[in-house]
Amino acid sequence: MKAEIHPNYHSITVVMTDGTEYVTRSTWGNEGDKLNLDIDSKSHPAWTGGQQQMLDRGGRVSRFQKKFSGFLKKD
């Protein structure tokens, strides 16, 4: 096996959408970095039963809704 081909595995702090933090080990970033989550299990509709709204990243959802707004409407 080749030496030094594995990524650096270190501790980081993950910040949830509600501000809670926990420390885990990851290959992301550098030792001690903070990873701020945009969506997590406390804010994603799949885990909240649809009570939270998804963020519209880059207007994708609004463009889709505009494009197909009258698609299934019955007169």
From Swiss-Prot:
<dbReference type="InterPro" id="IPR034704">
    <property type="entry name" value="Ribosomal_bL28/bL31-like_sf"/>
</dbReference>
<comment type="similarity">
    <text>Belongs to the bacterial ribosomal protein bL31 family. Type A subfamily.</text>
</comment>
<keyword id="KW-0687">Ribonucleoprotein</keyword>
<dbReference type="InterPro" id="IPR027491">
    <property type="entry name" value="Ribosomal_bL31_A"/>
</dbReference>
<keyword id="KW-0689">Ribosomal protein</keyword>
<protein>
    <recommendedName>
        <fullName>Large ribosomal subunit protein bL31</fullName>
    </recommendedName>
</protein>
<dbReference type="GO" id="GO:1990904">
    <property type="term" value="C:ribonucleoprotein complex"/>
</dbReference>
<dbReference type="InterPro" id="IPR002150">
    <property type="entry name" value="Ribosomal_bL31"/>
</dbReference>
<keyword id="KW-0699">rRNA-binding</keyword>
<dbReference type="GO" id="GO:0006412">
    <property type="term" value="P:translation"/>
</dbReference>
<dbReference type="GO" id="GO:0003735">
    <property type="term" value="F:structural constituent of ribosome"/>
</dbReference>
<dbReference type="Pfam" id="PF01197">
    <property type="entry name" value="Ribosomal_L31"/>
</dbReference>
<dbReference type="GO" id="GO:0019843">
    <property type="term" value="F:rRNA binding"/>
</dbReference>
<comment type="subunit">
    <text>Part of the 50S ribosomal subunit.</text>
</comment>
<dbReference type="GO" id="GO:0005840">
    <property type="term" value="C:ribosome"/>
</dbReference>
<keyword id="KW-0694">RNA-binding</keyword>
<dbReference type="InterPro" id="IPR042105">
    <property type="entry name" value="Ribosomal_bL31_sf"/>
</dbReference>
<comment type="function">
    <text>Binds the 23S rRNA.</text>
</comment>
